[in-house]
């Protein structure tokens, strides 16, 4: 997850399941993103102030909201599994898959803070695409292979349950796109205001 709230969302998962999310899903994506390409158009922007922290306040708020969403979505998915399908194991398995898919959405949202995840830059790093692919395949394996089911306490999911797992990730991705659209809309105005204050 992106904050303490995302960690809180794993409270209903077993320690082995939490370890799977962080070591098998989050860690590979994070490692590849740490070696990612520069943000498109970065050389056209004015330099950051020398005393500006690496994670600015706006990004901290963004991470806070993302983590809160992930925690809430995880808890909701667990409750759906318990209430609709009558099994905590189903709810935990759905939450495990949902967290894996949401981490893909988080990476797409935060990789380039203002650029759309649906642009050509998304496919510019094959290693990151492999990490995303592994997150999906790994989520499938952990619920389908008997040895992993026994190890992590998961159960097979139906097609309907997989769709429910996908919903939070899609919503998170679309919310990120909406936020980026607002930032891109405001950026020309900010540049114009900055240019107006610069003496000729």
What is the meaning of each model-derived region?
Residues 21-25, 98-106, 135-142, 169-176:
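Alpha-helical transmembrane segments of multi-pass membrane proteins
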Residues 5-6, 83-86, 147-200:
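Cytosolic catalytic headpiece
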């Amino acid at each position: 997850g992106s904050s303490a709230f995302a960690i809180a969302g794993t409270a209903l998962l077993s320690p082995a399941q939490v370890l799977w999310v962080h070591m098998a899903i989050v860690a590979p994506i994070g490692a590849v993103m740490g070696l990612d390409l520069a943000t498109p158009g970065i050389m056209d922007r004015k330099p950051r102030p020398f005393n500006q922290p690496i994670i600015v306040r706006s990004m901290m708020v963004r991470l806070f909201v993302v983590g809160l969403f992930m925690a809430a979505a995880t808890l909701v998915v667990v409750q759906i599994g318990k209430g609709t399908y009558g099994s905590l194991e189903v709810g935990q398995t759905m939450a495990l898959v949902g967290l894996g898919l949401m981490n893909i959405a988080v990476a797409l949202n935060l990789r380039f803070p203002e650029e759309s995840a649906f642009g050509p830059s998304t496919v510019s790093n094959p290693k990151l695409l492999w990490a995303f692919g592994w997150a999906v395949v790994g989520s499938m394996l952990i619920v389908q292979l008997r040895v992993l089911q026994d190890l992590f306490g998961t159960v097979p999911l139906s097609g309907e349950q997989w769709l429910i797992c996908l919903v939070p990730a899609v919503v998170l991705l679309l919310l990120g796109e909406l936020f980026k659209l607002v930032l891109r809309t405001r950026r020309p105005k900010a540049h114009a205001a900055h240019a107006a204050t610069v003496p000729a």
